[in-house]
Amino acid sequence: MPGGQSGWIRGLTGDQEIAARFSNQAQFESFARFESALIAGLARVGLIESQAASDLEGRILEFKPDENRIAAAAVIDGVPVPEYVRQLRRTLSGPGSELVHHGATSQDLTDTATVEALRKVIDIASARLDLLIADLDALEARDGNRTLKAITRMQEALDIQASSRIRIWRDPLKALSERVPSLRLETGKLQFGGAVGDLQALGENAETVAVTIADKLGLDWPGNGWHTTRRPFLACAGWLSELSAALGKIGQDVAMMALRGSVDIAFSGGGSSSAMPNKQNPVAAERLVALARFNTSLMGAMHQAQIHEMERSGAAMTLEWMVLPQICETTGCGLLACRELIGSVTRMGRET
């Protein structure tokens, strides 16, 4: 069997569009934007002449690092930034080049790159979520007046309209969609703390440099670094996991409706069986349940990654890198699978 996100299982559980936001290329491009913005900040406080800074900014943005060397060095350094900065410095010369990375630390780059990735993930997830809500609206318009048997505690209860169950699916999704603007604000924070989190290398220039970087990157400057306070990441992960759970609820319900037979639901497609060709397995529904449960388990690790010792934790950072992209990709996959599932429903409920 393939391990992790390799092999055929990527088609079941992966999301290429979201995975690309955490690729080497995306991360190193973010590093370049940070370093370029830092040069602009240093120029604003007079540490670099403006024309020299402008030249450096452009050259930094054009820099293409040796990814293989960075990967090899990261095993030794624990982070990709030291080798990235070494390579960058070797390519630059002239006035101001000695101040590349001045006042910053590796975590400033990796965290800010993650913030930029999460902003794009939120945009992708939000757009897909709005489409899914529209899909459910269309399903209700078509089948909402049909009748279903309510199920409470695994037993048949009273008759309900199909619209009642559809609303139960849709309402949590609408609430999550309404929270997107505040989530963007909470997640979109510049990370900039320097070596030990207090920007001491920049002295009285720290605030101006930080605000300049934030403005250049389109992020908010919270007034200080947050190396050991992971609220921006936890907020995003929590929203994504809550979304996965809402999708898992839909999958669980559809799977149980399929078990009850065509009186509850009929859909096109479905998975085949190697032993029983008569079967039409609700694979998309099963995927939603599995993805939701997986994200729930990953959230435990995200909470573990909140525990940083002293001013920085390499262990906590590594755990976060392992877990957070998976949460994003799992949620993205669930949104695609849920739209596929709802689109396959040909009838929900029986005639009243």
Stretches with model-predicted labels:
Residues L99-Q107, D143-Q155, L183-L199, K216-R231, ...:
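Core alpha/beta catalytic barrel or barrel-like domain that forms the active/cofactor pocket
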